[in-house]
From Swiss-Prot:
Entry keyword set: ATP-binding, Cell cycle, Cell division, Cell shape, Cell wall biogenesis/degradation, Cytoplasm, Ligase, Nucleotide-binding, Peptidoglycan synthesis
Function per UniProt: Catalyzes the addition of L-lysine to the nucleotide precursor UDP-N-acetylmuramoyl-L-alanyl-D-glutamate (UMAG) in the biosynthesis of bacterial cell-wall peptidoglycan.
GO cellular component, one term: cytoplasm
The gene coding this protein: murE
Species annotation: Staphylococcus aureus (strain MW2)
Gene3D superfamilies tied to this protein: Mur ligase, C-terminal domain, Mur-like, catalytic domain, MurE/MurF, N-terminal domain
Post-translational changes noted in the entry: Carboxylation is probably crucial for Mg(2+) binding and, consequently, for the gamma-phosphate positioning of ATP.
Record protein name field: UDP-N-acetylmuramoyl-L-alanyl-D-glutamate--L-lysine ligase
Gene Ontology BP annotations: cell division; cell wall organization; peptidoglycan biosynthetic process; regulation of cell shape
Amino acid sequence: MDASTLFKKVKVKRVLGSLEQQIDDITTDSRTAREGSIFVASVGYTVDSHKFCQSVADQGCKLVVVNKEQSLPANVTQVVVPDTLRVASILAHTLYDYPSHQLVTFGVTGTNGKTSIATMIHLIQRKLQKNSAYLGTNGFQINETKTKGANTTPETVSLTKKIKEAVDAGAESMTLEVSSHGLVLGRLRGVEFDVAIFSNLTQDHLDFHGTMEAYGHAKSLLFSQLGEDLSKEKYVVLNNDDSFSEYLRTVTPYEVFSYGIDEEAQFMAKNIQESLQGVSFDFVTPFGTYSVKSPYVGKFNISNIMAAMIAVWSKGTSLETIIKAVENLEPVEGRLEVLDPSLPIDLIIDYAHTADGMNKLIDAVQPFVKQKLIFLVGMAGERDLTKTPEMGRVACRADYVIFTPDNPANDDPKMLTAELAKGATHQNYIEFDDRAEGIKHAIDIAEPGDTVVLASKGREPYQIMPGHIKVPHRDDLIGLEAAYKKFGGGPVGQ
């Protein structure tokens, strides 16, 4: 596409050079800029990428978007704008032909449950023989092909490229985990959502948002916007068991479907039966009551299942068809995942990293604990420490607790575990500044019949260490290796 055409929708301060050049790529990553690319520089929290403009010029890039004029060769066109990332969004959606308009787009937000609900929607679509894509905490997936991702919600250009990739692969729908960071930072500008789903709102990310009010407002942006095409049939799915849904209902202009277990809603779960093999319940709907069975464990997952089913139903699939698909869904990786049922202990990993998430996790497993419940939890570095003692208090619902760091980054691991220990309500706990050693200790003290829960990371494949270096780490593999060494069995898979 000709650059002059691309910039027709952009208000610029000035253009230094010619826009008469062909463009086939937009990037905010200086390492990938080349001839035919537009490089969009920006001022981030830690890096000002304007300093890489000369490097991209050396790589053959002939057009840069900047917020002030740079010292560059005369053959490099500079487009000066006030807000480079907003312009990046406009350019990306224009160049890639507004890809989110070309499929059904589901957006899932909330403190806990985003990954589970988003993954369930994707898996239901696959059971229905529909081409589907997913983007979130567990990476990027088109049908069964997976690649890793860096952020829950990538920056705007990368996100648009992923949606375009899904469209080109024939995806009929795409499900996005929508983070509060992504909403506030404008990473979702230009994305057209068909269905927005809310799980819950509990304390998290106050290091970024400052207050719960600001955090809640960030989440509400998804429901008040849902894109720019107000003529489309769009829907909102809200959890009535969370009081924040009342506010979200007031900010969205679209039709709302509500679900709940404890509070009255249009769609409800009754007569709930739970085990470590899954759940069953009566799904009470405006159209009748249906029996639902699922391999997912825990009462909180019933809420997630309902949210996913309603989202898919809202776009035209019958509930009977969806319920049949739900019975055979694969587990969501790292979410209340039971590792190797042949072991004499119940070894479980989960992503719960807030007090609310941990409470729900313990609620789910405690009825099935045969002997002791051993619970390991970590606190992330450079995060909101005000939530940490409450996490320690909740962890002490278990018989024995292990406090570790989780992605300590530049914080002192001993400080992080000490913050968790401030909330301890009994003395049956121990602190480890090395998470792997904490996991090994959990297995070492476990006896047949015990339940060991490794919380906070799920299947996250790294630890963020000083200097923000990512060091390979897998809770599941470390736990299984220790369990096989003690109890026999194996080998550990990848």
